[in-house]
């Protein structure tokens, strides 16, 4: 039988590992949700984006790398402070699992979170959250 101190040490170690895993998984910059067999990636031009229009290029594929065409992808942009109206748009389909928003309008410099939600005709979904900082001018210094 283990002592109470050993049980507490084990519980503490497990809690510490869980916290560490949660922190490290957040370092990637994107949080994926939905069907684990779908992978959605985002590229933005210019980088960093500035106040005004930016092109969003979205790639949707399965885990084997096969492109996923026919999806409907909604994009929502939110600033990190309260009171800002979200910027909403829908991506247009290209080919080879590529979708784009030609002019996503970043209305203000600062910290943003883009939320992309994809729905395929077969009912599968994918969702990512992509934090980013919008510069005062396109391609200029952040902030």
What does each model-found stretch correspond to?
Residues 1-25:
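Sec-dependent bacterial lipoprotein signal peptides
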Residues 27-143:
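N-terminal soluble domains immediately following signal/targeting peptides that reside
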